Structure formats: C-alpha cells, structure tokens
Amino acid sequence: MLKGNGFVSVACAALLLAVTIGCTPQPVGQDAETAAPSGANNGESKQTAANTQHTQQSKEELVLSFYKDSSLSDEAKVRHMTDHLAGIQWGKINEIKEHQSLEIIEYLYRQRAFIPSESFANLIQASDGLDGALSESYAGLMGDLFTRDRTAMTRALANMDKTNRTQGIGSIGYALSYREPKEVKKEIQQWQAGQKLTTAEKDVIRALFVKLDNPY
C-alpha cells in the first residue's frame, strides 16, 4: 500500500507541475517579436500610399506638384523638381495648368544656385516642347549653369545622345553669344588648358565654339 500511495503522490505532483507550466503567461518580449506595433504599421502604410501616388503621377504632374508645395524650402523644391526633369514635355504642363511651363523655368533660373551639378544631365534632357520665351529662358539657365561648372556640364553633354547633346550645346551657345564671343572662347580655352578632357568632351567644346560663331 505504501508503494502504491507513493506512486499516486508522484503522479499527482507531475500533473500539477504540467498544469502550472501550461498556465504560465509568456513573456511580453516574445509577443513583441511576432507582432509589430500598430503605429509602425500605420506609418508604413502612409509611406507606401505616398510612394504609390508619386509612382502613378506623370513627370509633368510631379514637377508641378513639387513647385506648388508650399511646405518645401526653395532648395528642396529645386532638388525634387530637377530629379524629374529628364524627358519632361513642357506642353503637357501647360495642359495641366496654363502658363506654368514658363513660370517653372523662370523659377529654376532664379533658384539656379540650388541646382546640383549631378542634375545637369536631367536639365539637358528637358528641352522637349521649348519655343519662344520658353526657349529663351531655358537657354539662359543652361548658359549660367555651364559658366558655373564647365567641367560638370561638359561631361554631362559628352555623355548624352546626339539629339540632346546638340540641343544642349545650342542652348548654351545661344546664351553665351550675348557676350563677346572672343572673350567667351578665351575664358573657355583658359579653363580647358587645366583640364584632362576626353575626346568626347573636346568635341563638345569644339561644337560650342562653332555655335558661338553662329548661335541662330
């Protein structure tokens, strides 16, 4: 009987221990690993929605929306706008809102100090649909950017396809032709003497000199 009672006591103790362990709550940290906070999920959802909205917008709509965004500083506006200029069609911007193309180009000219050199390639590829006052303002912007950083602009032009390269050189040559061409060439030659230009970059400078002599 004693042996039987001992066996029963051991069995009961084991059962009680199993029940106790099963009822013990899991540490909070374990739940935190498997479930993300609702606030984080909401933040990710909002960011995803914003990214989706930008993805669905055309280049023209994006540039216009950044230009109209009063919450951005001029520097931030310019950087966002120039990020999306490549391949833009200025006529489409006017279809969205009349006269905005000229307003935007003139704004970029006024804020040209904020245009980073790495965005020059995007600007070169933003010549579709330019005419009249638009073309004049665009040329003025390109000419000033070339004067500010000849190395970056020459490199960007050298890496362009023929159509965009020709258009870019033409705009710069037209803008610089308002000054004395001989003086402009002299300045460029002095700069060039201290550079190690590639063959393509030298071709850009030669083409620019030709354009200075015949800007129209």
Where are these regions (language model features)?
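Bacterial N-terminal signal peptides that target proteins for export
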Residues: 2-11
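Intrinsically disordered, low-complexity segments
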Residues: 7, 36, 40-43
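C-terminal motif of bacterial Sec signal peptides marking the signal peptidase cleavage site
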Residues: 19-22
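Bacterial signal peptide processing site
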Residues: 24-26
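Intrinsically disordered, low-complexity segments enriched in small/polar and acidic residues
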Residues: 34-35, 39, 48-50
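Non-catalytic all-alpha helical scaffold/repeat segments
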Residues: 43-216
